Each structure stands twice: as C-alpha cells, then as structure tokens.
C-alpha cells in the first residue's frame, strides 16, 4: 500500500527544518552546518566552478577568457541554500572574448600573455533548481 503524500512531505521537510534555523529576533537565517570540506570531484562543486568562471569571465576586463587549471579546495555550508567556498587556480587562455564555448581553448603559451591567478569563489546554490549566485570572489596573481 502506498504511503499518503502528506507523510512523504513531512518526512522530507523535517530534515530540512533541522538543518536550517531562523533567528526570530533578527529575522535572518543562521547556518546550522558550518563550512566543512567536500570532495572537489563532487558534481555540485563542478557546476559551481563552471558558473563562477562564467561570471568571472563576463565581469573581467581582460581581452581573453580564463580557464580553471585546478580546483584546489572546496567547502560546503548549508543555510537557506547550499553555499560553496571554492579555491581554484586559473589561467589566461588563447581564446579572445566574447566566447560561448571554451572547448578548444588552452592555457596561453606566449610568455608575454601568460597569466595565472588564485581565486576564491563563494557560490550560493540550489542546484536541483539550477539556481546559482556568485556571492563573492577574490583573485590574486600567482
């Protein structure tokens, strides 16, 4: 016999309610699960890196597209969404902007155009809805 729909909903909502709390006095969401390391090969991490780089390249004034060389570290925190803190190493590619497809791009080989950076991105995500927001980014030359 099938479970009633309401029972399934309750069983789904309880863990979510336990994971996130609201401070009524300040009317803001508090993290119940503080940043913890996660595997850099996690599918959601890869989606967030793709999104962060798309935003980075859109906002960058550089003439060339930057690509991820390596994902260095990833952390996850659960609030009213999933927040991913991701550290990456990126480099300038041989592809000029604007560009929608980076499949044929490779890191820049000309010494005068080579540039590597270390970046930390904070991405808010509801991956099951396809919703991503770049909450912060910090990059420095390597």
From Swiss-Prot:
Its subcellular locations are:
Secreted
What are the annotated GO cellular component locations?
A: cell surface; cytoplasm; extracellular region
Q: Which CDD domains match?
A: CY
The record's InterPro entries line, in alphabetical order, gives: Cystatin_dom, Cystatin_sf, Sperm_Mat_Cystatin
Tell me, what's a Pfam family for it? Cystatin
Q: Give expression by tissue.
A: Proximal caput region of the epididymis. Lower expression in the testis. Within the testis it is localized to the elongating spermatids, whereas within the epididymis it is exclusively synthesized by the proximal caput epithelium.
Q: Which residues are glycosylated?
A: 39, 100
Q: Name one GO molecular function term.
A: cysteine-type endopeptidase inhibitor activity
Known Gene3D superfamilies for this protein?
A: 3.10.450.10
Q: Does the keyword Secreted apply?
A: yes
> Which keywords annotate this record?
Disulfide bond, Glycoprotein, Protease inhibitor, Secreted, Signal, Thiol protease inhibitor
Kindly state the positions of the motif Secondary area of contact in this protein. Answer: 77-81
Q: List the disulfide bonds.
A: 95-105, 119-139
Induction per the UniProt record: Testicular factors or hormones other than androgens present in the testicular fluid may be involved in the regulation of CRES gene expression.
Its signal peptide is 1-19
Family under the similarity heading: Belongs to the cystatin family.
Function, in words: Performs a specialized role during sperm development and maturation.
Q: What is this protein called?
A: Cystatin-8
């Amino acid at each position: 016999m099938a479970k009633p729909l309401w029972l399934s909903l309750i069983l789904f909502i309880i863990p979510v309610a336990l994971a996130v709390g609201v401070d009524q006095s300040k009317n803001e969401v508090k993290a119940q699960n503080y940043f913890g390391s996660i595997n850099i090969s996690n599918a959601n991490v890869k989606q967030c890196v793709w999104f962060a780089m798309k935003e980075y390249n859109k906002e960058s004034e550089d003439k060339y597209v930057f690509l991820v060389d390596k994902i260095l570290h990833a952390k996850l925190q659960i609030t009213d969404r999933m927040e991913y803190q991701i550290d990456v190493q990126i480099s300038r590619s041989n592809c000029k902007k604007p560009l929608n497809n980076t499949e044929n791009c490779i890191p820049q080989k000309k010494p005068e155009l080579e540039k590597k950076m270390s970046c930390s991105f904070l991405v808010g995500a509801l991956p099951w809805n396809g919703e991503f927001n770049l909450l912060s980014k910090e990059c420095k030359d390597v």
